[in-house]
Regions:
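Condensing-enzyme catalytic core mediating Claisen C-C bond formation in acyl metabolism
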Residues: 9-13, 40, 227-303, 311-312, ...
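Conserved small-residue
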Residues: 14, 32, 92, 114, ...
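Active-site-adjacent elements of ketosynthase-type condensing enzymes
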Residues: 47-60, 125, 205-232, 274-294, ...
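Glycine-/small-residue-rich "gating" segment that lines the acyl/pantetheine channel
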Residues: 135-142, 180-183, 187, 196, ...
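Conserved beta-ketoacyl condensing-enzyme motif
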Residues: 12, 36-173, 202-213, 307-323
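Active-site-proximal alpha-helical scaffold in enzymes
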Residues: 88-101, 151-154, 159-203, 242-264, ...
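Conserved small/polar residues in nucleotide/adenosyl-binding loops
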Residues: 403-410, 422-424
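ACP-dependent fatty acid/polyketide chain-elongation machinery
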Residues: 1-77, 257-269, 364-378, 417
Length: 424
């Protein structure tokens, strides 16, 4: 039995995106490889007393490529959920439609699960409801407040929408959330707990309290408020903090034979997953990058690969003064001489840091790099920090022919690494 379980392969058959570059996979990808930026000045709420006044914000409207909430939920339903749930539903709906998976019989529905997480959840709803309660009293609190804010209800809403009655789960691991969701969902398929899993991350923390909290921790960029598109600059010596972003990335994962039998389109194969914790600090990574090193090593071991097998790394690369160099050095330490042939870029330079949605969004970017033979660039990398001498794909996307690619996500004490490859 153990041998048969270990041989279950996991592939990606559907993808969906809602990002600061637009709503939908195609529009987001095209803008990404054309080195466009989704980071702009915040105009949705008052930022006059905030030190950071910029964010990666989803374009909302009816024009092509914009996010229109009415496309995904009725107005009444929109009022019953926080935006992070709305974004998650939108990305999941895209992914499910893209996969073509529409189970009709109970057995197939029971073998289809959902695992979507968020780093923070309904922060805007919590903030708004706190104000209402303070100003108008407890009786004015909406009965939808709690279900609108709970992180697990992204998975719940998606399951209800499609009547998926398999494993229903959620992940809350800060910036590693989206990557953990994919890895954990893949393991459910590998272990035969499910045949299909809808997995990913979503986040909507661009609000006054979210901005104020990260600013108080001195985590955000503050030197580029007048030129927001220049603010996220991973590995550049002038970086001064990350740019918060919002959005969702969701994938449909499927057991290989199951996908093959129904003639599904296969984007990539999930080949490895590694986790670690550096047991160091709640917000700062260990100076020697030990957590990232172990997570990468574990992912390679899981995939039965060597560092020399890896062609491209989509890095965590948040644009923080401390984290970027630590991650870079951890990669070089593990890869040794193989680091000279690896390309590594950070797509946060285009969309900001999507927190709980970062890992899944960047996993999708990695898959699209495999599919299209194009590595997305690191924007604003004008003067690399001393020692940052890997190929960091500055400014322009690069045409490649790669087979094994890696998506990274890190959050201080938490580390998660995914390995993706072309389906053989």
């Amino acid at each position: 039995m153990e041998e048969s379980l270990s041989m279950r392969r996991v592939v990606v058959t559907g993808i969906g995106l809602v990002t600061p570059l637009g709503c939908g996979v195609d529009v987001t990808w095209q803008r990404l490889i054309k080195h466009e930026s989704g980071i702009r000045k915040i105009d949705a709420f008052d930022v006059s007393d905030l030190s950071s006044k910029i964010a990666g914000m989803i374009p909302v409207g009816e024009e092509p490529g914009a996010f229109n909430p009415d496309d995904w939920l009725e107005p009444k339903e929109q009022r019953e959920v926080d935006d992070f749930i709305l974004y998650g539903i939108a990305a999941a709906s895209q992914a499910v439609e893209d996969s073509g998976w529409q189970p009709k019989v109970e057995e197939d529905k029971d073998r289809t699960g959902v695992l979507i997480g968020s780093g923070i959840g309904g922060l805007q709803s919590i903030y708004n409801t706190s104000i209402i309660m303070h100003e108008k009293g407890a009786r004015r609190v909406s009965p939808f407040f709690i279900p609108a804010s709970l992180i697990n209800l992204v998975s719940g809403h998606v399951a209800i929408r499609y009547n998926f009655t398999g494993p229903n789960h959620s992940v809350v691991t800060a910036c590693s959330t989206g990557a953990h969701a994919i890895g954990d969902a893949a393991r459910m398929i590998e272990r035969a707990d499910a045949d299909v899993m809808v997995a990913g991350g979503t986040e909507a923390a661009v609000c006054r309290i979210g901005m104020a909290g990260f600013a108080a921790a001195r985590a955000l960029s503050t030197h580029f408020n007048d030129t927001p598109e220049r603010a996220s600059r991973p590995w550049d010596r002038d970086r001064d903090g990350f740019v918060i972003g919002e959005g969702a990335g969701v994938l449909v994962l499927e057991e290989y034979q199951h996908a093959k039998k129904r003639g599904a389109k296969i984007y990539a194969e999930f080949s490895g997953y590694g986790m670690s914790g550096d047991a160091h600090h709640v917000t700062a990574p260990a100076p020697n990058g030990s957590g990232a090193y172990r997570a990468m090593r574990n992912a390679l071991s899981s995939a039965k690969m060597e560092p020399s097998d890896i062609d491209y790394i989509n890095a965590h690369g948040t644009s923080t003064p401390l984290g970027d160099e630590i991650e870079h050095d951890a990669v070089k330490r593990l890869f040794g001489s193989a680091a000279n042939k690896v390309s590594m870029s950070s797509t946060k330079s285009s969309i900001g840091h999507l927190l709980g949605a970062a890992g899944s969004t960047e996993a999708i970017f990695t898959i699209l790099a495999i599919q299209n033979g194009i590595v997305p660039p690191t924007l604003n990398l004008e003067n690399p920090s001393e020692g940052c001498d890997m190929d960091l794909v500055p400014h322009e996307a690069k045409a490649v022919s790669y087979t094994h690619l890696r998506a990274h996500e890190t959050e201080a004490d938490l580390e998660c690494r995914l390995l993706l490859e072309k389906k053989k």
